């Protein structure tokens, strides 16, 4: 695979494209794209740009350099702090994680993690989560929230950071990333869309021990139609910062890759914010001309950048643009003047004397609970196992039913997530083999930088016992044994297991023998066995899901602080299940083909240059399963509830602008509207996620292009409406270097999942 060399530095060159299949001996390459496009201050950015331009014009060269790099400080524990310019009232920026709340501090909330949000398929809840989480970051003096996560998208099912993102699907990811960004920035903090781009595994994500970081070799069509798709939505939503990724893309490090930063992000997408690197990912000062605006931490960056400008290697205009983009983001979200707390004001060392800063607000509590409820997915429910109806006796089994033994000052909230003691000493990004179950206690998020410490953990057993006290239910439990005794009087046996994932290492598999054995052992003794899995990604269930005594299965994902309480509401029918899978669950690992394992997992000792060819193109997850006619165990978009729904009255309106070719308008123009009616034809309240899939010529059989979640009482109907843009119908033309609508027939499918299609029609273009 190779990006051919450009004939000039123009951003619109036809030469800047990849050939999908070439001789294996050839190396993928990224062409240089220069100069770095300066900020234009267009549209909604105009006022912020004008203010930033005025402020930066008063800065010296040293002051501009100072705000482009991170400094160590004892004043706070922010992940990064930029330099300040006190004489001009520039206070600097505090940059900090995490994906489910402010980490390394106290008096904050632990929101549901990204994957849990993806399973909710709920746009409004995603926005509300983003808003209230953003307010907590602001209260702590965090200027830049290092999220949300649009990459890893999830190409490799065992990848360690898939849980930080929302879903494997680029359309769903784009919508939820955009909702999060709008919420964060309306709260007054700068959102960061990350990691740009191709950061699809943890193994060899950075250079270690003389081995280069893995190179994600991706063709131009796949970049646009799959991996860059959610970043397009993020930029359109106004993301004020972006983070480049650790690994190489087409054999150039992403944070030095001018094709990615200058050509795609700042050029094609017209990104107006600033680009920062992932921590310690800088390689040389040439990154500045490649489009990088901020370095964390600084190291020798400031000295080298100043020297490069003085000797003409880097232009002063590039430095001015770097500083302007950073300051403009500050103005853009309203952090100037007295509108924002002192940077890092609530980010103190927890072991040192400090004045507590309360970040939580009462208005967020129902949002956190609703979010926890909404991301649970019911996959099996037979023999009327659920909802529970005042059982006389419940038996609870499994290590995941209770809290970890410690919650103290752990800044990464590892707790039970360290499935092996050795994990604490292992080098991130290296090949390791850890237990796939975190047996130290229930998991409410994945591990490391994407996780924060919760104010409390509502664990399943405690929540069940609280309900049992009201119902006079007798509760048995055994949380340690792999083959526990079962009281024959149990109305139901609940088995709690988990599947952990964490930044730094990819998973060793998609199931573990101990947990599977526990389920089978309980099911052999209990006729009503209900399995609940807290999972940080895909978890195989074929080992036991067809056992006649396994009556119900819940994918509980990563619900945050209200985990147990939310689950009990669902188990007892106080709330209804409405989540849908944001990924496919296969029968076996082999169903994935070559993308099951991380690239270079079998690297030879003398191979210092690991390569990862994305030869599958856009065919991942359900797109791939559909194309190869592989039947999954549970398909993308699947989820049961306590009622059923009927779909009817499909109709399609098309605009005169829906024509073949490049088109005269924007790719964001609405060119079609699809209507349908959803009716609750069951006997209980519920919510259905109506999903729209397009069959685009010369593409995967179905691609998600719309979804609407509608709550209905029994017997009630409601219309759903899907507005489709020109981009939704387009493919990326690698010759024209434009989004193009092809001539042909486009199938339109509306249904309850990617395989449960209820209504279909065609659009001819």
From Swiss-Prot:
**What are the GO BP annotations of this UniProt entry?**
cellulose catabolic process
Concerning SMART domains, the annotation shows: Fn3_like (SM01217)
Cystine crosslinks: none
Which Pfam family name is an example for this entry? Answer: Glyco_hydro_3
This entry's Enzyme Commission designation comes to 3.2.1.21
The pathway is: Glycan metabolism; cellulose degradation
Quote the function comment for this protein.
Beta-glucosidases are one of a number of cellulolytic enzymes involved in the degradation of cellulosic biomass. Catalyzes the last step releasing glucose from the inhibitory cellobiose. Shows higher activities on cellobiose and cellotriose but lower activities on laminarioligosaccharides and polymers.
Q: What family, per the record?
A: Belongs to the glycosyl hydrolase 3 family.
Print the miscellaneous field. The biological conversion of cellulose to glucose generally requires three types of hydrolytic enzymes: (1) Endoglucanases which cut internal beta-1,4-glucosidic bonds; (2) Exocellobiohydrolases that cut the disaccharide cellobiose from the non-reducing end of the cellulose polymer chain; (3) Beta-1,4-glucosidases which hydrolyze the cellobiose and other short cello-oligosaccharides to glucose.
Return the protein name: Beta-glucosidase cel3A
């Amino acid at each position: 695979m190779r990006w051919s060399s450009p004939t000039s530095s123009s951003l619109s060159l036809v030469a800047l494209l990849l050939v999908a299949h070439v001789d294996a001996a050839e190396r993928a390459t990224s062409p240089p794209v220069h100069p770095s496009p300066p900020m234009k201050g267009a549209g909604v950015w105009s006022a912020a740009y004008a203010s930033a331009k005025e402020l930066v014009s008063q800065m010296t060269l040293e002051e501009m350099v100072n705000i482009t790099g991170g400094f160590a400080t004892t004043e706070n524990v922010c992940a990064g702090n930029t330099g300040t310019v006190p004489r001009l009232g520039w206070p600097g920026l505090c940059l900090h994680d995490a994906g489910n709340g402010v980490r390394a501090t106290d008096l904050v909330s632990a929101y549901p993690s990204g994957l849990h949000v993806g399973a909710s398929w709920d746009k409004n809840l995603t926005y509300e989560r983003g808003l209230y989480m953003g307010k907590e970051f602001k209260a702590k003096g965090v200027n830049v929230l290092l999220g949300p996560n649009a990459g890893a998208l999830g190409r490799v099912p065992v990848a360690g950071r898939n849980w930080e993102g929302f879903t494997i699907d680029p359309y769903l990811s784009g919508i939820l990333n955009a909702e999060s960004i709008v919420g964060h920035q309306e709260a007054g903090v700068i959102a960061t869309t990350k990691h740009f781009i191709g950061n699809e595994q943890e193994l060899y994500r950075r250079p270690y021990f003389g081995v280069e970081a893995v190179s994600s070799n991706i063709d131009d069509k796949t970049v646009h139609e799959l991996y860059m798709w959610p970043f397009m939505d993020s930029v359109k939503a106004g993301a004020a910062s972006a983070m480049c990724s650790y690994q190489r893309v087409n054999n150039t490090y992403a944070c030095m890759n001018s094709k990615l930063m200058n050509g795609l992000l700042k050029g094609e997408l017209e990104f107006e914010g600033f680009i920062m690197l992932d921590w310690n990912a800088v390689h040389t000062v040439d990154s500045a001309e490649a489009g990088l605006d901020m370095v964390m931490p600084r190291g020798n960056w400031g000295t080298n950048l100043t020297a490069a400008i003085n000797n003409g290697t880097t232009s002063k205009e590039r430095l001015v643009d770097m500083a302007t983009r950073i300051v403009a983001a500050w103005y853009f979200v309203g952090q100037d003047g007295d509108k924002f707390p002192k940077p890092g004001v609530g980010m103190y060392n927890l072991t040192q004397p400090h004045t507590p800063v309360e970040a939580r607000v009462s208005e967020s509590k129902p949002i956190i609970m609703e979010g926890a409820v909404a991301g649970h997915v019911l996959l099996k429910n037979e023999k009327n196992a659920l909802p529970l109806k005042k059982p006389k006796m419940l038996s609870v089994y499994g290590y995941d039913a209770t809290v970890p033994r410690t919650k103290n000052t752990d800044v990464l909230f590892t707790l039970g997530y360290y499935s092996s003691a050795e994990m604490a000493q292992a080098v991130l990004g290296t090949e390791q083999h850890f237990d796939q179950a975190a047996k130290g206690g229930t998991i409410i998020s994945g591990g490391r930088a994407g996780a924060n410490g919760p104010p409390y953990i509502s664990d399943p057993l405690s929540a069940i016992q609280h309900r049992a006290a009201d119902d006079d239910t007798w509760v048995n439990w055994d949380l340690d044994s792999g083959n526990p005794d079962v009281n024959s009087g149990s109305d139901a046996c609940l088995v709690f297991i988990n599947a952990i994932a964490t930044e730094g290492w990819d998973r060793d598999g998609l199931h573990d023998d101990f947990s599977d054995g526990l389920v089978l052992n309980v099911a052999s003794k209990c006729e009503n066995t209900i399995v609940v899995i807290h999972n940080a990604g895909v978890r195989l269930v074929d080992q036991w899901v067809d056992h006649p005594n396994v009556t119900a299965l819940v994918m509980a994902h990563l619900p945050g602080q209200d985990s147990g309480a939310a689950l009990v509401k669902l188990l007892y029918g106080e709330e209804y299940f409405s989540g849908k899978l944001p990924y496919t669950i296969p029968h076996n690992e082999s169903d994935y083909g070559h993308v099951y394992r991380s690239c270079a997992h079998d690297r030879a000792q003398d191979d210092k240059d690991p390569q990862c060819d994305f030869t599958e193109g856009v065919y991942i997850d359900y797109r791939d399963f559909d194309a190869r006619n592989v039947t999954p165990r549970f398909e993308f978009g699947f989820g049961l509830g306590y009622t059923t729904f009927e779909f009817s009255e499909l109709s399609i309106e098309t605009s005169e602008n829906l024509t073949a070719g490049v088109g005269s308008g924007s790719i964001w123009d609405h060119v079609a509207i699809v209507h349908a009616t959803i009716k609750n034809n069951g006997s209980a309240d519920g919510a259905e996620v109506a999903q729209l899939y397009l069959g685009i010529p010369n593409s995967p059989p179905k691609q998600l292009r719309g979804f609407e979640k509608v709550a209905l009482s029994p017997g009630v109907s409601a219309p759903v409406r899907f507005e489709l843009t020109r981009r939704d119908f387009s493919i990326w033309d690698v010759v024209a270097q434009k989004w193009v609508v092809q001539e042909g027939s486009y199938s339109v499918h509306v249904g309850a999942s990617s395989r449960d299609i209820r209504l279909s029609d065609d659009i001819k273009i």
